[in-house]
Amino acid sequence: MPINIPTHLPAKQVLESEHIFVMDESRAFHQDIRPQKIIILNLMPKKIQTETQLLRLLGNSPLQVHFTFLIPSTHTPKNTAREHLDEFYTTFSNIRHKRFDGMIITGAPIEHLAFEEVSYWEELKEIMEWSKTNVTSTLHICWGAQAGLYYHYGVEKIQMPKKIFGVFEHTVLSKHERLVRGFDELYYVPHSRHTDINMEQLQAVPELNILTASKEAGVCLIVSKDEKQVFLTGHPEYDTNTLLQEYERDLERNLSTVEAPKHYFAKGSNEPVNRWKAHATLLFMNWLNYYVYQETPYEWD
């Protein structure tokens, strides 16, 4: 089945060129199928890039999936055209009365700030509280994961002496969880962050299970025991060249602490190697199937 997105969304042409089945809203309306309704709170600066990355990972599902894009009303994005936001995005006041099968809260390059210093923190708290009753399962990514752990469970983020930057090997710790079904014992995930999770606080929360971790990058995948909250500290949605673009950006800024991303380039080459795409797709498919589709009633009350 296809993903159902607006006809003129820029990601549509990219996904179709990759032979991902995309259906516009008018055609989907005439199919007698209840689509999975996913809302994406996109906090990343390059919104079109993030839209494409996430839709690509969810586009191989046998389910029909309909997407709604959300931005905070208390923050004005600087890197995306107003016309794009007006056409494809909505705000919380317009959807708070609705229910969604799944929700994705993306990362944001604001980890240097305390959560309470983030301009849209109060609105984000309201959205996360709303998600507990109006969303079947919520997937938090990178800073979104840190924000979710802090809000829901009081787990704080900690500043790291060096940026966690590269593609790191991870081990599956809980092999019987549905979210990691089909995973190899070792798999790879890109990371790009200056902060980590307070492990002492995390391990003291009985409602959470740690599913995967890396010796170099720390805990990666955490899930609440009721499967409603999923926390992902890395960026498996990243394109092959995303870390390279971030590295070149930091070099241009003349940051003194810039180091090349670890385990990212082919040996003896400056070309990156994508070793995470298959597991990234499997992770998103497992979440959509086991935590969203199988847990949501056909008709919500």
From Swiss-Prot:
Please give the biological process terms from Gene Ontology that the record holds: L-methionine biosynthetic process from homoserine via O-succinyl-L-homoserine and cystathionine
Record-listed E.C. numbers:
2.3.1.31
SUPFAM superfamilies according to UniProt? Class I glutamine amidotransferase-like (SSF52317)
Q: What class of enzyme is it?
A: transferase
Q: Which GO terms describe its molecular function?
A: homoserine O-acetyltransferase activity; homoserine O-succinyltransferase activity
> Catalytic positions?
C142, H235, E237
Instruction: Write down the Gene3D superfamilies for this protein, in alphabetical order.
Output: 3.40.50.880
Question: Where is the site Important for acyl-CoA specificity?
Answer: E111
Record-linked CDD domains: GATase1_HTS
Alphabetically list the UniProt keywords: Acyltransferase, Amino-acid biosynthesis, Cytoplasm, Methionine biosynthesis, Transferase
Q: Which family does it belong to?
A: Belongs to the MetA family.
Q: Outline what the protein does.
A: Transfers an acetyl group from acetyl-CoA to L-homoserine, forming acetyl-L-homoserine.
The entry's protein name is Homoserine O-acetyltransferase
Q: Give the organism the record lists.
A: Bacillus subtilis (strain 168)
Q: What is the gene called?
A: metAA
